[in-house]
Structures are given as C-alpha cells and as structure tokens.
Amino acid sequence: MFTSEKGVVEEWLSEFKTLPETSLPNYATNLKDKSSLVSSLYKVIQEPQSELLEPVCHQLFEFYRSGEEQLLQFTLQFLPELIWCYLAVSASRNVHSSGCIEALLLGVYNLEIVDKQGHTKVLSFTIPSLSKPSVYHEPSSIGSMALTESALSQHGLSKVVYSGPHPQREMLTAQNRFEVLTFLLLCYNAALTYMPSVSLQSLCQICSRICVCGYPRQHVRKYKGISSRIPVSSGFMVQMLTGIYFAFYNGEWDLAQKALDDIIYRAQLELYPEPLLVANAIKASLPHGPMKSNKEGTRCIQVEITPTSSRISRNAVTSMSIRGHRWKRHGNTELTGQEELMEISEVDEGFYSRAASSTSQSGLSNSSHNCSNKPSIGKNHRRSGGSKTGGKEKETTGESCKDHFARKQTQRAQSENLELLSLKRLTLTTSQSLPKPSSHGLAKTAATVFSKSFEQVSGVTVPHNPSSAVGCGAGTDANRFSACSLQEEKLIYVSERTELPMKHQSGQQRPPSISITLSTD
C-alpha cells in the first residue's frame, strides 16, 4: 500500500469523527464520488495484517448503523470482499487476524435481523401465481371465470416463502458460518441496483476464487494465495448466482461468465441440486453475445413479456356447445322435411367423401336427379294424419332441391364451422340409433346400404340381389349415394323407389343410396 493511499484513508477516518450530525446527508452524498477513497479501502481490506484494517472496519460499522441510506449502501459495496477475506483467513486457520472483519460481519447481521423497534424481522416472498398477471407473463383468457367450488376453495391461496426469524449471533462458528454469510449476501443482493461497477467486479472475482480454491481449476485460473479448499453451502451458492446474474446485464459480462462456469464446476463436484438448477437456467437464458449496458443509467435485468393475445379460441367446440346445438336443432319446427333431407345428405356426403372422394360429385348429381324426378315416391307410406302437409311439402321439393344442394356446398367450402356442425350431426345416441319394432325394413335397408358402400370402397364386386335391399333398382342402383345419418327416429320412414333409366348410361359406377322421406309428425 502506497503512502498516498494510506493518507487518503487516514483523512477519511478523521473527517467523519469531527463531522456534525446536521451535515451527515451532504457528506453521504459526496462520499460515493470519491473513487480514490474506494480503491484505497479495497486495498486495506485485502491486507489482513494492515494496521488500518481495524479502524476501517469500525468506521464502516458506524456508517451502517447511522440510519443514513447512502452510508449503508457505501458499507454494503465492500461486503463481497469482506466475505472473501474472512473465508480465506478461516481456511488458513489464522483466526486472530480476522477478528475485526468477523466483528463487522456479525454487527451487520445483527442489525439486519431486527426492525427499527428492535423486534425480530421476518422476510417473506410471495410466489406469483400463473393465473394472475405479472411483469413476467400474461395469463391466457379462458372465457368467463365461473365461481366453482374448486375455484372458491383456492381463492386467495398463494404460496409464501419466509426467511426468519433469525437468531442473534455473538460469534461465527463452523456450524453457523454460512447461515450468517448467506443472509448477508441476501441483504447485498437486495441493494444490487445501488452497487457500483467495482463492487460487481469484486463479487464475480470472489465467487470464482471461493469455488475453485483447492481444486485443479485453480491452476487454470492462475489464482495465487491460499490453496486449501473453502467449504460452501448450497444456499450460499444460490445467493452468489443472484448477484452474478445481475452482473451479466450490467457491464460485467466476461467476469460474470467466468464466475458462472466456476460455480457450475463446484456445484457438480459437491452434487448440489439447487445451484445446478439455477446456474443452468441462467446459462440457458443468456443471449449469444455480451449485452450493451449504460453503466451510468438505470440498472435492470431484461425480461421477455409474453403477448397479451388470447391463446384459446372463443369458438372452441365443447360438450356444452354440442348439447346446446342439438337442443336448438330438435326444437326448430320450421324446417321442412326436404330441408332435413338436405342436411342428412350433406352429412352423408362428408362421410362418404372420406372413403372415396373421387365419386362424391357423381353421388351429389344422382341424388339431385332423384329428388327432382320423383318427388312423390313414398307417399303411400305416409301417415294419414300428415297427408295434407306432406303433399304441400312434396310439391315444392323438385324446385328447391338443387338450390339447397348448391347453397349447402358453398357454405361448407367457405366456413369451417359448417364442417364442425356436420361432424356433430354424425354423433347419434343409442336411443336414436336403435330402430322401432315397426321399422324393420329401415334397419334392414340401412345395413344393406352400409355393406354395399364398404364393398364398393374396397373394390369388391358383389352380384346385385334385389330382395336384399329396399328401395334399390335391379340394374342401375348398385352404387347409389348412401344417406347414413339417421338422426330423427320419429321423422324418418323408408320408401321404395325405382330408378328411371338414364339416357346416357356410362361405365362409371355410382355410390349406393337409399331414399329417405321425412315427416313432421
């Protein structure tokens, strides 16, 4: 230590003793600008045999208990260097030369564990809930927040982490050493934004030295001094990582990178899961290159905020929406029988297009032709009570059949919601699927048409049997378009129909079909 540096420290010691209490705030404001004093104090602390070490430690303790915030921060900036000097002296078993440093650390610890009234202080931290917004994330919108029993039971519940109460210590031993030092690093990390760059550099350097001393990496780092291993605890290493993470984004990239690697190295040797988890998380979140930082501006850790857009579609298909759609559809009495037939044909077209998409267009044209040419095939099978209404409906069937098909096909191509609704109509309950005793012909027809449809898809040629299917012709209806969505058990009847001979008979086969007539009875 040079004479000039020693003179600066001695002047600083004498100045504070003669300082009146009224001028203490101005003195604290001007103290942080004295860079030469700070560097001289670091050199005094690094020399355990210096005669100025004891008065310097006493002066720093007076600063800390003065109650002035800036004087407290001035003392805290030397805390990493003080911890390193204490651990180095303890490892060399030269306890007598570290008495003043130990007294300063104990004094700061005992002041921090109590509040201004002298009561034991309990520090708490509330872990943020993912269901509530924070500076780190925006919860996704899930629609209306229903007050269910589960939601009410969890309302207001959040996990809180407590630190304390901490007992007072009169001396540092091997049992309580890292409990005290971990708490002191916690206090230092709470004031990281007020620490100068020289303090962050000291933090990174002492973290590297503590982790590699006594291990082969010490020769790689070329650290001189003690060569014995310094024991550390898992919580102490986590607190070191907190300060290093801050140093990454505040102008000390290289030193912080070296310290992070050394902490991972030591945590792997000690098999500490907590520092390994935190260190690897920090390493994975770092950018590829150093961050530019304005050392004179506000210090902060950059975080990425998630977008506020909704992540769940408001048109999502749920069991409630399907049930509501089914009720609405069953309660609508304004639909005519032909409109219901168009909807069933549309659903069946979607089913058959998955099996053989190449024949779907021909099936549509054939169904349209059948609807326009034979509007009154199933009239004999209608109930007497609904004959008048059925006659009026069949008079308008031939005119609106093609219009219905064109409108349905256009709507299905333009909107994805129609496809979802079509899939919903394929869902039949057990009660709707079972036929009534009076409708054995309908069940027989449906089974025959299904078997013929799948035989056509698989490419197997089956000789036509007129007696095995109801409503199928003798020569031209082997591949008719099938209508398999039978959803209204009271409105569906089977009517036999004959196929008029086509003028242009082609070799292309058409999908099998059945004729369905609906009644509003």
Swiss-Prot record:
Residues modified to Phosphothreonine: T306
Compositional bias segments (type: Basic and acidic residues): 390-406
Keyword Cell membrane part of the UniProt annotation: yes
Pfam families assigned: Hyccin
Ranges annotated as biased composition (Low complexity): 355-373
UniProt-listed InterPro entries: Hyccin
Region (Disordered): 355-413, 501-521
Name listed for the protein in its UniProt record: Hyccin
Gene name linked to the record: HYCC1
